Amino acid sequence: MHFASVWESIADVIGDETAVVHGDIRRSWSEYDERAARMAAAYVAAGLGSDSKIGLYMYNGNEYLEAQYGGFKMRGVPVNVNYRYLDEELWYLLDNSDAEALVFHSSLGDRVARVVDRLPKLKLLVEVDDGGPGQVPGAQAYEAVLAGHDPMPRISRAEDDIYMLYTGGTTGMPKGVMYAMGGMTGGFVTSGFPLLGLAAPSDASEIAALVKGAAEAGNRLISIPAAPLMHGTGVWLGAFIPHLAGGVVTTLQNRSLDADELLRLVEAEAVTNLTIVGDAFAKPIIRALDAAIAAGRPYDTSSLKMVISSGVMWTAEVKEQLLDRVEQLVLLDAIGSTEGSMGMSITMKGLPPSTAKFSQMPTTKVFTDDDREVQPGSGEIGMVAAGGNVPFGYFKDPEKSARTFRVINGQRYSFPGDLAMVADDGSLILLGRGSQVINSGGEKIFPEEVEEAVKRVAGVHDCLVVGIDDEKFGQAVTAVVSLNEGAAATEGEIIAGVKGQLAGFKAPKRVVFVSQVPRAPNGKADYKAAKQHALDATA
């Protein structure tokens, strides 16, 4: 299977059905396919070929999806570029990826202009007009590029074509994780059709007929990826899964989460699936639902069937609050990373929610440092290993590839760095990233466990926990906390609140209050920035 080939077959059978919505823009599957084919022709005309890297430096929108699809069509490799990156970060990623083309929003053009002279491999610059100044010499307007090229004829493609997604760089410099296109496409096809109540097709040739039948029955996935498409959660769960099942991807216009915009769109487009990133997204949605009810204009969320989250903690309390307001929901909490998928938990009304406890994928294991498999109920801590569709490796980094992607007992695994125990029932109890573990007074403390406890204290809105060098303890547990508007929790109250839930040594030694806890656009914790807040406050 191959993303582009599957989507072409879908466009052939439901061409008049909607594929993409962004504000007033609506693209049918035929239009989506044609615009992507024009973009593919532009890439080829500029001298790009199979395996050429194409940077996507954009916010969510139809152009992101079209430019990506166009890259897949000509067997290129679209590369996600974080729209928060400033000059040096942008240069690093485009240089590291060997990018030959860059599609970018004009509001980001000033950054592009300052680095483009240091990127000699770039052959094509395409600027998407979003009201920015447009300052990049040699850049071509996106719509003019499409108009200036006939659609590229369809071609055959290989399942071992490379799909690549760059990591967020939370534990070092961003790295390109390379997968086989066939395995990636097949995995997401398997995930999508069961959401329609259909058995997953065993072969690509079955997809078009299944999609056509579902569309004729009015059975389609209508998705909002609330997370950025430049991250795996947004593009994999929020876009690839619905599109591979012939669905609709509806993107938000605001560039930071506006829960009211999201809920208005759920109502207007009869959205069935929502992709978020844990509590950071779920809490504002809950507040917006409550405010709308209080104002006498509740949102119609009756179409919404599933909320999917991945990437950060989604606590049991917040899941329960969401189900109290939208009772028909299925909440799917996935554990994974750019390097692999490891497990999930499913919560519905009447099924007790949990935090950081997941059913393992059949190919997931937990291994100790000496490569022994952790047994259920043993209490041992090990590193989570994801089997199944394992990446080729990291682009241009064989040493890190050898450390992360290893063979144990004849099976190849990915070790993204997550520590876990295995419960008596075989489920994973996720403890957190090994690189974030705090060693205080000889005890290992997992930040996520403390963060969850802090967030239960009255008045706390958000929290990250870091270790700060300390003469007495080695590292002092330090909570970086933001409060709800109007709340007045004190350091002592927060420390006491945690001690009422966890062993005393896990409680913060210090609490640093900030107006906003630092997180990436996808809701993931920015521990580097949080640690700097803590250092600045305790200097």
Regions inferred by a protein language model and the residue ranges of each:
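AMP-binding/adenylate-forming catalytic core of the ANL superfamily
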Residues: Y85, W91-Y92, E100-F104, G387, ...
